[in-house]
C-alpha cells in the first residue's frame, strides 16, 4: 500500500503542477521520468497489464518494456517500467520506404504468430490473463466484461451490447452469421501503429497490453482495424492483412455491421 500511496501522490502533485503552471489540465495516464523510466496508471477494472507484459516477456521473444515494479491501490493499478527509445510506428510509417515497411511487417507477423501460439490454459474460455474479466475500448461504455465460458457466450455479449442501437431482427441476422466453432488465441487487443515503437526498420517494443487476453482468433484482425477516433491510413489497413496470419475479412465486415451503429461503443 505504501508504493501505491507514493504513486498516487506523484500523480496528484504532477497533475496539479501541469494544470497550474503549464496549462495542461489533461495530462494523461503516463509520465516519463528523467531516469529512463515510465510510470503508468490505469483502472483496476479488467486486465492486469503488468502481469500480461511479464507473461509475454517470459514466454515469447516479442519486445516489450521491462517491468521494474507494479502495485495497486486507490482504485488504480500502477506500473513502473523502462522507457523504450524510438518512434511510434504511427508517425514513422508515413516516411518509410517499401523495404523498411516490409521489414517491419515481417517482424510483426512473426510476433503475432508467437502470440497466437501460446497455449490457452482453459479453452474455450474467453478472458484476460488468469481467467479474469476482459477490458476493451470496443465496448468501453460497459467497463470490464466476462469472462465467458465459450466463444458463443462472447458473441452473445457482443450482440447484447449492440441491442440499444440496432433493430432486433437485424441483430438476429448478424448473430446467425457468427461462427462459434473457432479457436481462442492470445490477442493484444489494440494492435495499432500508436502502440508499436520502432528504431529505423526494427521493432523496439510493442506496448499498451491492457486489453490483451484470450479471444476468438479473428479478434486481433478486427481490433487492428478498429480506430473510430484515430488516424485512418489505408496503407496500414492493407498492411494488417499481411501481418495477421489468416484472413478474417468476413468477420471484420460482420463486426462493422454492428459498430457502425454503436455510438455508445465509441
Region locations from a protein language model:
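Catalytic-loop of the protein kinase fold
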Residues: 186-188, 193
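ATP-binding pocket architecture of kinase catalytic cores
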Residues: 19-140, 148, 183
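Acidic, glycine-rich loop-and-strand cores that form catalytic or ligand-binding grooves
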Residues: 122-176
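Juxta-kinase regulatory segment immediately upstream of eukaryotic protein kinase catalytic domains
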Residues: 1-20
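Charged phosphate-binding loop/patch that engages nucleotide di/tri-phosphates or the phosphate backbone
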Residues: 20, 239-266
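Plant-skewed but cross-kingdom recognition/interaction modules and surfaces
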Residues: 45-49, 193, 202
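Active-site Asp-x-Gly
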Residues: 151, 181, 185-186, 199-249
Amino acid at each position: 500500500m505504501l508504493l501505491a500511496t507514493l504513486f498516487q501522490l506523484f500523480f496528484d502533485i504532477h497533475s496539479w503542477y501541469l494544470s497550474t503552471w503549464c496549462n495542461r489540465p489533461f495530462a494523461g495516464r503516463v509520465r516519463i521520468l528523467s531516469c529512463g523510466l515510465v510510470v503508468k496508471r490505469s483502472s483496476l477494472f479488467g486486465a492486469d497489464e503488468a502481469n500480461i507484459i511479464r507473461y509475454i516477456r517470459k514466454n515469447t521473444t516479442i519486445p516489450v518494456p521491462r517491468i521494474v515494479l507494479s502495485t495497486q491501490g486507490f482504485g488504480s493499478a500502477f506500473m513502473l517500467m523502462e522507457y523504450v527509445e524510438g518512434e511510434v510506428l504511427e508517425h514513422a510509417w508515413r516516411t518509410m520506404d517499401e523495404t523498411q515497411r516490409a521489414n517491419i511487417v515481417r517482424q510483426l507477423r512473426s510476433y503475432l504468430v508467437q502470440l497466437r501460439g501460446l497455449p490457452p490454459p482453459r479453452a474455450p474460455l474467453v478472458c484476460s490473463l488468469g481467467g479474469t474479466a476482459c477490458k476493451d475500448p470496443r465496448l468501453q461504455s460497459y467497463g470490464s466484461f466476462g469472462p465467458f465460458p465459450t466463444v458463443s457466450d462472447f458473441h452473445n455479449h457482443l450482440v447484447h451490447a449492440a441491442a440499444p442501437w440496432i433493430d432486433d431482427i437485424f441483430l438476429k441476422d448478424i448473430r446467425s452469421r457468427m461462427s462459434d466453432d473457432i479457436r481462442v488465441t492470445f490477442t493484444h487487443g489494440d494492435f495499432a501503429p500508436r502502440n508499436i515503437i520502432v528504431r529505423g526498420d526494427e521493432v523496439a517494443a510493442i506496448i499498451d497490453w491492457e486489453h490483451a487476453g484470450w479471444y476468438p482468433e479473428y479478434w486481433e484482425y478486427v481490433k487492428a482495424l478498429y480506430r473510430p477516433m484515430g488516424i485512418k491510413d489505408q496503407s496500414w489497413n492493407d498492411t494488417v492483412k499481411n501481418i495477421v496470419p489468416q484472413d478474417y475479412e468476413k468477420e471484420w465486415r460482420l463486426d462493422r455491421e454492428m459498430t457502425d451503429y454503436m455510438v455508445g461503443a465509441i
